[in-house]
Swiss-Prot record:
NCBIfam families in the record: recf (TIGR00611)
GO MF annotation terms: ATP binding; single-stranded DNA binding
Keyword DNA damage: yes
Name of the protein: DNA replication and repair protein RecF
Chain's gene name: recF
Length: 349
């Protein structure tokens, strides 16, 4: 459980500290005061990434030299300092130089309005989801993914520089290396999706009218991947890129057997993604034997009272949960309330 959050120059929060004393934390305030920034800081401290922007320096307050996040979680101090030139990660004040050694020390599951892109967005956004979640629990996956990206970059560079290439020896060597790593990533993604579908079934025993399923859509089968790499060299040379592989995978979220992208309303889409995140939470617990922290940004908006109550009833008491909202919280639940105004703590009780 996170017991302390301390931020410096992070977004619009210049000097912010709050102590946490309950598993359920409700962060209230008007739009623009920094509610989402608190959740982003926790996500950043856990994953070294922002869920909002691919430009890391955007997290540094304007005209400041750095931003920092300090979290105390189960007596362990997590700290990440971001400058325009890079970032520095420490655990209990000892520097962790390899990001692969840092990721997974603190595990989080995040829901934000942007996550509707898991249904409506591009395949690259869905692949990013697969990678981020698997990286948190599997060092092997992270290592394989980094290797795959490195080999893919080499192969694509070779394809671009040698448009008249006729000797495919080195191209085939890179193809075999890509295949060896790629099929391991394929297997982990497939197992991950199968595991989430099992979690969906468990959740659906309580809510039988809400059927969600995840369908893996690999770009190419394991059996055909190596064959493609060894027989489609001319095609890859023409397009100057590797045209098949796990870097082009996708998945669909199905609602009552239909593609949610085409069949689900905005409100239903939010619930589908929420269901996905709750399943993910339970999967992480099963695999790692630890409880991930659930971060919910503006999760209650666009949900009617019945759906709000349905959602709140599903929150496990075993996980720490942070929720941002501009709405009053209904129901008899025990929580810590933090009210933000102009980036400062007005009330935390």
């Amino acid at each position: 459980m996170i017991t302390s959050i301390e931020l410096r120059n992070f977004r619009n929060l210049e000097n912010y500290k709050v102590l946490i004393n309950k598993p359920l934390v409700i962060i209230q305030g008007l739009n623009g005061v920094g509610k989402t920034s608190i959740l982003e800081s926790i996500y950043f401290a856990a994953t070294t990434k922002s869920h909002r922007s691919s430009v890391e320096k955007d997290m540094i307050q304007y005209d400041k030299p750095y931003a920092s996040v300090k979290l105390i979680e189960d007596s362990k101090l997590h700290e990440i300092v971001l400058t325009p030139n890079g970032k520095r990660t420490t655990i209990n004040k000892s520097e962790v130089r390899k990001i692969s050694d840092y990721i997974g020390q603190l595990r989080v599951v995040m829901f934000a309005p942007e996550d509707l892109m898991l249904i409506k967005g591009s395949p690259s956004e869905r692949r990013y989801f697969l990678d981020m979640e698997l990286m948190q629990v599997s060092k092997t996956y992270l290592r394989n993914l980094n290797s795959y990206k490195k080999i893919l970059k080499q192969r694509n560079a070779l394809l671009k520089k040698n448009r008249n290439l006729t000797d495919y020896t080195f191209l085939n060597i890179l193809g075999e290396q890509l295949y060896d790593v790629g099929i391991q990533i394929f297997d982990e993604r497939q197992k991950f999706i199968e595991a989430l579908n099992q979690k969906f079934k468990t959740i659906q025993t309580k809510y039988k009218d809400f059927e969600v399923e995840m369908l893996y859509e690999p770009n190419v089968t394991k059996e055909n991947f190596l064959k493609h790499l060894k027989t489609k060299q001319k095609q890859d040379i023409m397009y100057e890129t590797t045209t098949a592989g796990i870097h082009k995978d996708d998945f669909k979220l199905l609602y009552k057997g239909l593609n949610a992208k085409d069949s689900a309303s905005q409100g239903t889409s939010r619930l589908i993604v929420i269901e996905l995140k709750l399943a993910l939470l339970e999967w992480i617990k099963e695999v790692t034997k630890t409880d991930a922290i659930l971060l919910l940004d503006d999760v209650l908006s666009e949900l009617d009272l019945e759906r709000q109550n349905l959602f709140m009833s599903q929150l496990s008491k075993n996980h720490q949960v942070f929720i941002t909202t501009a709405l009053p919280i209904n129901g008899h639940i025990d929580f810590q309330k933090i009210v933000l105004q102009e980036g400062e703590t007005i009330n935390a009780k």
